[in-house]
UniProtKB/Swiss-Prot annotation:
Transmembrane segments: none annotated. Disulfide bonds join 47-62, 54-71, 61-89, 73-87. Residues 21-44 form a propeptide. The presence of a 'disulfide through disulfide knot' structurally defines this protein as a knottin. One of its GO terms (molecular function) is toxin activity. GO terms for cellular component: extracellular region. This is U1-lycotoxin-Ls1ff. InterPro entries: Spider_toxin_CSTX_knottin (IPR019553), Spider_toxin_CSTX_Knottin_CS (IPR011142). It is found in: Secreted. Keywords: Disulfide bond, Knottin, Secreted, Signal, Toxin.
Length: 110
């Protein structure tokens, strides 16, 4: 019985401490969120969207839902027989799998 009482007091103390910390974090998070939204809007204007050409700027792809798109390159043979490299911003297969698992987890656990 003493153990249950001690455990209950410890649990209540931890809960009250974490809720006070969360309130402080929310205040700071509001300010940080506003600044990050402004920065993201500026960065979004300069980034390359999904499925667009990124041959000249391989590190300029935009962010997806969870991950930043990667510049994926392939070698293309032109009508004249020359091989050229063409690149586009896309989601790598392992990122697609991770997004699928996260999406499935969100549906299950809400």
């Amino acid at each position: 019985m003493k153990f249950v009482l001690l455990f209950g007091v410890l649990l209540v103390t931890l809960f009250s401490y974490s809720s006070a910390e969360m309130l402080d974090d929310f205040d700071q998070a509001d300010e940080d969120e506003l600044l990050s939204l402004i920065e993201k809007e500026e960065a979004r204007k300069d980034c390359i969207p999904k499925h667009h050409e990124c041959t000249s700027n391989k590190h300029g792809c935009c962010r997806g839902h969870l991950f930043k798109y990667k510049c994926q390159c392939t070698t293309v043979v032109t009508h004249s027989g020359e091989e050229t490299e063409r690149c586009f911003c896309g989601t790598p297969p392992h990122h697609k799998a991770a997004e699928l698992v996260v999406g499935f987890g969100k549906k299950i656990f809400g």
